[in-house]
């Protein structure tokens, strides 16, 4: 028996640090199941599958705004290293894919865009695949409290901030539902927490879903966003074609 990250470092011919980072990023699986603990003791003959990370791509660019497709497993804050001179306008969770916006920092448009977010004048639409069958549109209105330590964790609490999510079923197959999701507020992990709250957690959510899954990622995609006369769409990856 040996620690997982040490075995992975030998298989991939990489450092222990790099092996740990790959496991912590959710990019390593064994027999179709995601490996969650880098120090887990495993047999010497264990074989790992390592998922490759895509690079972000440009959806649209002008003098005001840069709309990108963010692949899963890339931190939003790392995007500025790919696109110099631009600043993040908002963020997506690391495992969430989809459209994300950057602007020229402290420009007139940046100030207007920040105000649009503050005034809830930004329209966002997500796609999510959840456990179980949801047959009707519904609104989830439950306050969310976020606890921030080394990693953020949110939960439903009377002490939390207002949070409203609207879900619409698009397709049902094999006891899973593909949802269109709209949010009226923007709390940390809002969609993930609200869907867990109604007992339909997102498939592949290792933080809020305890059920084992063969999904290689969190099945949440930022599909569309509109603000200040702009509207952008990121086509959903093939894994959303259920």
UniProtKB/Swiss-Prot annotation:
Keywords: Isomerase, RNA-binding. Gene3D superfamilies: Pseudouridine synthase. The lineage of its organism: Bacteria, Pseudomonadati, Campylobacterota, Epsilonproteobacteria, Campylobacterales. It is an enzyme of class 5 (isomerase). GO terms for biological process: enzyme-directed rRNA pseudouridine synthesis. The keyword Transferase does not apply. It comes from Helicobacter pylori (strain J99 / ATCC 700824) (Campylobacter pylori J99). The active site is at residue 93. Residues 2-62 form the S4 RNA-binding domain. GO terms for molecular function: catalytic activity, acting on RNA; pseudouridine synthase activity; RNA binding. It holds the Pfam family PseudoU_synth_2. This is Uncharacterized RNA pseudouridine synthase jhp_0890. It catalyses: a uridine in RNA = a pseudouridine in RNA. Its EC number is 5.4.99.-. InterPro entries: PsdUridine_synth_cat_dom_sf, PsdUridine_synth_RluA-like_CS, PsdUridine_synth_RsuA/RluA, RluA_PseudoU_synthase. Belongs to the pseudouridine synthase RluA family.
């Amino acid at each position: 028996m040996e620690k997982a990250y040490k075995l992975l470092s030998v298989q991939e011919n990489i450092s222990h640090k790099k092996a740990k980072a790959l496991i912590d990023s959710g990019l390593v699986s064994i027999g179709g199941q995601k490996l969650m603990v880098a120090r887990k003791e495993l047999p010497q003959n264990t074989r790992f599958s390592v998922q490759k990370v895509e690079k972000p791509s440009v959806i649209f660019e002008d003098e005001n705004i840069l709309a990108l497709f963010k692949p899963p497993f890339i931190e939003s804050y790392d995007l500025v290293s790919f696109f110099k001179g631009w600043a993040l306008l908002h963020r997506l969770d690391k495992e969430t894919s989809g459209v994300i916006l950057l602007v020229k920092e402290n420009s007139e448009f940046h100030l207007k865009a920040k105000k649009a977010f503050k005034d809830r004048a930004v329209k966002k639409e997500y796609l999510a695949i959840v456990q179980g069958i949801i047959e009707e549109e519904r609104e989830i209105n439950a306050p969310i409290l976020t606890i921030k330590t080394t990693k953020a964790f949110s939960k439903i609490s009377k002490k939390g901030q207002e949070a409203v999510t609207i879900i619409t079923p698009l397709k049902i197959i094999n006891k899973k539902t593909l949802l269109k999701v709209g949010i009226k507020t923007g709390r940390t992990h809002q969609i993930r927490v609200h869907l867990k709250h109604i007992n339909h957690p997102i498939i592949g959510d290792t933080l809020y879903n305890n059920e084992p899954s063969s999904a290689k990622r969190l099945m949440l995609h930022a599909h569309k966003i509109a603000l200040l006369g702009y509207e952008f769409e990121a086509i959903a990856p093939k894994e959303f074609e259920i």
